[in-house]
Swiss-Prot record:
This is AA9 family lytic polysaccharide monooxygenase D. Lytic polysaccharide monooxygenase (LPMO) that depolymerizes crystalline and amorphous polysaccharides via the oxidation of scissile alpha- or beta-(1-4)-glycosidic bonds, yielding C1 or C4 oxidation products. Catalysis by LPMOs requires the reduction of the active-site copper from Cu(II) to Cu(I) by a reducing agent and H(2)O(2) or O(2) as a cosubstrate. It comes from Podospora anserina (strain S / ATCC MYA-4624 / DSM 980 / FGSC 10383) (Pleurage anserina). Lignocellulose is the most abundant polymeric composite on Earth and is a recalcitrant but promising renewable substrate for industrial biotechnology applications. Together with cellobiose dehydrogenases (CDHs) an enzymatic system capable of oxidative cellulose cleavage is formed, which increases the efficiency of cellulases and put LPMOs at focus of biofuel research. InterPro entries: AA9, AA9_LPMO. One of its GO terms (molecular function) is metal ion binding.
Length: 345
């Protein structure tokens, strides 16, 4: 008969396999050119991995950053993150299409996008705790009539696990860290139950814009008790307070669609360049399926630090819990940590 220890180990391994379903950004597409992301399955074990625009991180289990770590540097660009040594040139006004390898349907929540200027230091050298992030887009609750609701994360799944981010046309040229994040709220009703999945990339914005909004240090973006962090999704909802600093006036999410990949490209390195944004070649290597475009709208509240995202579809105005509400989904990663504690006992 297997020992308790061996049973515990098998359960832990099963939990680890389930955690790997969370996902990470595998590549970024700009004007049809696909740039490789940080490959958590090979780069950490490669002596000289390629220089990419995606920041490195130690989330080899596709894990998350919990609210208990919001004051630590892990929340900035994920656990033990380090500067990317490459960057992608993007013209102001262009879109960046990020493709996740997968995302679990049960992990409902908002999708938020930030920029942080690297100034004259360069994003490959800047200290991450010095970065000050401002929002360029946010999307949250799409329809809350029936728990757990339809969320931006569901739109991402329907869009082939991908998300379109528009770089503001009036943004000042320079090097920036693009911070793309999904916040999973399936356990958000519990203190420290939310799960943040930040993904960072170095970009160089070209153009003649002059706008550079005031930013917030990454370690000050959220607190564990923010209304949009400790949030129960298992009830009918008519709104959701997206966490983080307010979205600057004039910035908004774009219609979600697809982006054809017609070439592969390599991130550039070294000093800043005045080169134009990458233009795709005519040699097709892959095409992303084109799902139905889904649009969300933003309801801004300039006096508040949060704003709600809804569609024009009417939703229930009652926020009371429904009588037969679904039960929160327990993340396998939490069970795995519990099993480790039991094995050590």
């Amino acid at each position: 008969m297997p020992s308790f220890t061996s049973k515990t180990l098998l359960a832990a391994l099963a939990g680890a396999a389930a955690v790997n379903a969370h996902g990470h950004v595998k590549n970024v597409v700009v004007n049809g050119a696909s740039f490789q992301g940080y490959d958590i399955n090979s780069f950490p074990y490669t002596q000289n991995p390629p220089k990419v625009a995606a920041w490195t991180a130690s989330n080899t289990d596709n894990g998350f950053v919990g609210p208990e770590s919001f004051a630590s540097s892990d929340i900035i660009c994920h656990k033990n993150s380090a500067n990317a040594q490459g960057r992608i040139v993007v013209a102001a006004g262009d879109s960046v299409f990020v493709q996740w390898d997968t995302w679990p349907e049960s992990h409902h929540g908002p999708v938020i996008d930030y920029l942080a200027s690297c100034g004259n230091t360069g994003c490959d050298k800047i200290e991450k705790t010095a970065l000050e992030f401002f929002k360029i887009a946010e999307a949250g609750l799409v329809n809350g009539a029936q728990a757990p609701g339809r969320w931006a994360s569901d739109v991402l799944i329907d869009n082939n696990n991908s998300w379109m981010i528009k770089i503001p046309a009036n943004i000042r040229p320079g090097q920036y860290v693009l911070r793309h994040e999904i916040i999973a709220l399936h356990s958000g009703g519990d203190l420290n139950g939310a799960q943040n999945y930040p993904q960072c990339f170095n970009i160089e914005v070209t153009g003649s814009g002059t706008v550079l909004p005031q930013g917030v240090k990454g370690t000050s973006l959220y607190t564990p008790t923010d209304a949009g962090i400790r949030f129960n999704i298992y009830r009918s909802l008519d709104s959701y307070p997206i966490p983080g600093p307010a979205l600057p006036a004039g910035f908004a999410p774009v219609a979600q669609g697809s982006s054809a990949i017609v070439s592969s490209a390599t991130a550039i390195t070294g000093a800043a360049t005045n080169a134009p944004a990458p233009i795709a070649t005519t040699t097709a290597v892959n095409v992303v399926p084109s799902p139905t475009t889904i649009v969300t709208s933003v309801v801004q509240t300039s006096a508040a630090q949060t704003s709600a995202v809804q569609t024009a579809v009417p939703v229930q105005t009652s926020t009371r819990p429904i009588s037969t509400r679904p039960q929160p989904t327990r993340c396998p990663g939490l069970g795995r940590r519990h099993l480790r504690k039991v094995a050590r006992a």
